[in-house]
C-alpha cells in the first residue's frame, strides 16, 4: 500500500509474527488488535477498529473493515468483511463478502459429516444475516 511509510503507526499485535514481514499487509487503525496466535499476511489490510484473535488467519488480498474474526477462522483470497463478526473454524474465500452487521458462527460436528466446516466462497454476499454451524454458501 503506497500510503504506508516507515514510521507510520498502525494497530497492535501481541507478537511480531502476527503481522507478516513479507507482502504489504497492514493494520491501519490504532484501535485494531491482532493477538492470541492470529496472523495477518500477504496483502491483507485492516481498516477501522478490527479484532483478530485466537488462531484466525487473514491472508492474500483480504480487506477487513471494522470486523471481528476469531477462533480458527480462515479468510483468504479477495474476501471483504465489513462491520461483521466471524467466529469458529470456517473458511471464507474467493471473492466472498460478509457485510452490514452479519454474524458467522461456525461449529463442526453438528451433522453426520463431523469434519465439514462452514464455508462462504465464490462470489457469495452475506448481508445483515446470521450464518451458523456448517453452512455452505456460494
What are the residue ranges of the model-derived segments?
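Functional cleft and adjacent loop/helix regions within the main domain
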Residues: 1-22
